[in-house]
Amino acid sequence: MAKFEAHLKCSFCGKSQEQVRKLIAGPGVYICDECIDLCNEILDEELIDNQTKTREANNPSNKNHTAITSTSKPAPTLATIPKPIDIKDFLDKQVVGQEVAKKILSVAVYNHYKRLAWQGDGNQETDLTATRLHKSNILLIGPTGSGKTLLAQTLAELLDVPFAVADATTLTEAGYVGEDVENILLRLLQKADMDIELAQRGIIYIDEIDKIARKSENPSITRDVSGEGVQQALLKMLEGTVANVPPQGGRKHPYHDCIQIDTSQILFICGGAFVGLEDIVQKRLGKNSIGFMPTDSRGQNHLNRDLDNNQMINNLEPDDLIRYGLIPEFIGRMPVTAVLEPLNSEALEAILKEPRDAVIKQFRTLMSMDNVKLEFDEGAVTAIAQEAFRRKTGARALRGIVEELMVDLMYKLPSEKNVSDFTVTKKMVDEMIIGGKVLKLPSNEKIDHPESA
């Protein structure tokens, strides 16, 4: 037996067991430690080659970095940044009301991009004694449908910068099922056509930020992976850091290269309804409970409660947000707070008619493609606005109501050749609201349009 063992050798290189450190036996074969090391080197080389090919195929930011940066839009200069008054004038064309919020946003956005222009001139790099300008992110507080997302979107349109919207309710702390916070940056990068420099000057709007408030005022012994954990994960990104973003989204992988994005120049705007925040404010102020007021069939008296609640929110202090569930560090990184007012029926009427992309203007354009002139009389506009106000979902309700109203009309009109114009009246809107009836073409097809009620 000893004689047999003396002749054992590696089945691959032929070296005997005396010539190597280790000889591992298998079913009828042997392999030495030197051959194992050689196999590992071959596998590592193939793995690196495959990673390089995959990265070049799937990561355009690395493959075309030189081409992308050479065609990137120039950084803003003080001469090209619109002034706060001009910014507000542009917002007025798209957003009805919210005068105070628009003024706050105009100043905050102007200062942010003025800071970028100042840094782009090299002031902060050449003069070590120069004052450092820090970023001021924005927190928007307002009921649903009051225009929070539209304000942020309109600002990005004016400034011609990439704009991405993220939903805070989908985010979770790293290591748990859900989206990592870095995926927010990937959306912005995709909006910028993978242009890193352009993305770093963009705007990110994080909606439903109130939904990541921690569940209780006191820290819990259990993990709050979609509440306080997400707030902690967002801190560095909001303040300004170099984040590693997986180019394909999802979780980070140790074998995948990440794109590095500097968030110090990205403007973050967070928005939420913060339902119940007014109760926290009124408790601090020692006010009597507002309570729900009696309403008529149209829900008109709800407006008084909304206005009182809005007055409460205007007395907001950071401590109220902490009691609501935001951590102090998170609030400190959102120094600019703008409160949006609830929309009354008059504001909803204006939203129906006045903005560039008003709902009525959109439907007129759609009908004009079928050579039909569509009109809404004043009574119809008022009735639609009052119904939207009753539904308590803000401006979002307007389009849904008009869609319900027009569905049958828009189904038949494209096939009608002898209808040149159509007027929507208050009677038609009331019939739809009360009886669920939709607009129909006149029974006499020779009539161009129905008489106003």
Curated annotation (Swiss-Prot):
Coiled coil: none annotated. GO terms for cellular component: HslUV protease complex. Residues 57-74 have a biased composition (Polar residues). Zn(2+) binds at C10, C13, C32, C35. SMART domains: AAA, ClpB_D2-small, zf-C4_ClpX. It holds the Pfam family AAA_2. The gene is clpX. It comes from the Bacteria. ATP binds at P143, T144, G145, S146, G147, K148, T149, L150. InterPro entries: AAA+_ATPase, ATP-dep_Clp_protease_ClpX, ATPase_AAA_core, Clp_ATPase_C, Clp_protease_ATP-bd_su_ClpX, ClpX_bact, P-loop_NTPase, Znf_CppX_C4. GO terms for biological process: cell division; proteolysis involved in protein catabolic process. Component of the ClpX-ClpP complex. Forms a hexameric ring that, in the presence of ATP, binds to fourteen ClpP subunits assembled into a disk-like structure with a central cavity, resembling the structure of eukaryotic proteasomes. One of its GO terms (molecular function) is unfolded protein binding. Keywords: ATP-binding, Chaperone, Metal-binding, Nucleotide-binding, Zinc. The keyword Metal-binding applies. This is ATP-dependent Clp protease ATP-binding subunit ClpX. Residues 1-51 form the ClpX-type ZB domain. Belongs to the ClpX chaperone family. ATP-dependent specificity component of the Clp protease. It directs the protease to specific substrates. Can perform chaperone functions in the absence of ClpP. Residues 53-77 are annotated as: Disordered.
